[in-house]
Structures are given as structure tokens and as C-alpha cells.
């Protein structure tokens, strides 16, 4: 199984790239994790936000292909670390690759939400999307460590 983070936005601060890369390199070869960045649509005073969201959504879904789609969204289901580890095990048993979608400033398109098999809420708080990349990578690495009895996670 391959994990794929599909995120809107291409120019992240150095600290985001450093943090994300740190967890990316820790993933084992039998569970590769990749980042696919979708260019954010131009937002301005008179921007058609729905059209921008729809275009970003089309690109995200094209990148995900036939993968299991999991959206990152506030109204999604909150998983604690052991629950995420169980989800990761289910995904591995399913055999399909998994695409986790992070929207832009206005969130995800309706098409992305409709295509999702699951929706994961990291918090009821609104989090900066660059920070979400790092949190997701660390959370998935921690979940993997539980499933393999790796000493990274401590109870």
C-alpha cells in the first residue's frame, strides 16, 4: 500500500518542508508516502471561489485516481492515535493505495467530499494548511509505529 498526501498549495515555508520531509524519510519501503502538490487557484477580490474549488478538486481527484480517498476536514471523524493505527491496518488489508486530501484556504470541493470514503478531522480547530501536512505525516508515522511495535510511540 502506498500513502499519498494530495494538498493544495506549492510554496510552503522551509519549516513545513523540513518537518514533512523528516517524517517522509522515516516511512518504510513497504509503505511509501508521497506528497502531491496541487497549484492553488488565483484568489483575489472578485475571484469565483466555487470555480476555483471545483478546479482544485478536479486536479486532486485526478491525482488520486482509483485510490481510497480520505479527506481532511473539520466535520470529519476524529481518530485518536490507536484508532488511526487500526484504520491504517484496515487500509493495508484492503490493498488499495490511499490518498489523503487537504484543501486550500476555503477547504475542499463538493466533488472531493462526495468521492471520499472517509473523512478525518484532526481537530475542531481551524488549522493552517501547511501545519496540517506535518501533523498528518507525523500521525501516520506514529500509527505505523504502533502497527509494527516500533518504539517511537509510547503509551
Swiss-Prot record:
Specifically methylates the pseudouridine at position 1915 (m3Psi1915) in 23S rRNA. The gene is rlmH. Homodimer. The keyword Methyltransferase applies. PANTHER family: METHYLTRANSFERASE, RIBOSOMAL RNA LARGE SUBUNIT METHYLTRANSFERASE H. HAMAP family: 23SrRNA_methyltr_H (MF_00658). S-adenosyl-L-methionine binds at residues 72, 103, 122-127. GO terms for molecular function: rRNA (pseudouridine-N3-)-methyltransferase activity. Gene3D superfamilies: 3.40.1280.10. This is Ribosomal RNA large subunit methyltransferase H. Its main location: cytoplasm. GO terms for cellular component: cytoplasm. CDD domains: RlmH-like. It catalyses: pseudouridine(1915) in 23S rRNA + S-adenosyl-L-methionine = N(3)-methylpseudouridine(1915) in 23S rRNA + S-adenosyl-L-homocysteine + H(+). Keywords: Cytoplasm, Methyltransferase, rRNA processing, S-adenosyl-L-methionine, Transferase.
Amino acid at each position: 500500500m502506498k500513502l499519498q498526501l494530495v494538498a493544495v498549495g506549492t510554496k510552503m515555508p522551509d519549516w513545513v518542508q523540513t518537518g514533512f520531509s523528516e517524517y517522509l524519510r522515516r516511512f518504510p519501503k513497504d509503505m511509501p508516502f508521497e506528497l502531491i502538490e496541487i497549484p492553488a487557484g488565483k484568489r483575489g477580490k472578485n475571484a469565483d471561489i466555487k470555480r476555483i474549488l471545483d478546479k482544485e478538486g478536479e486536479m486532486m481527484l485526478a491525482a488520486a485516481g482509483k485510490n481510497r480517498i480520505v479527506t481532511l476536514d473539520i466535520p470529519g471523524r476524529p481518530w485518536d492515535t490507536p484508532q488511526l493505527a487500526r484504520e491504517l491496518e484496515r487500509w493495508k488489508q484492503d490493498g488499495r493505495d490511499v490518498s489523503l486530501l487537504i484543501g486550500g484556504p476555503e477547504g475542499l470541493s463538493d466533488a472531493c467530499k462526495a468521492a471520499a470514503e472517509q473523512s478525518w478531522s484532526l481537530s475542531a480547530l481551524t488549522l493552517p494548511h501547511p501545519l496540517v501536512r506535518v501533523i498528518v505525516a507525523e500521525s501516520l508515522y506514529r500509527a505505523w509505529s504502533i502497527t509494527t511495535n516500533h518504539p517511537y510511540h509510547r503509551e
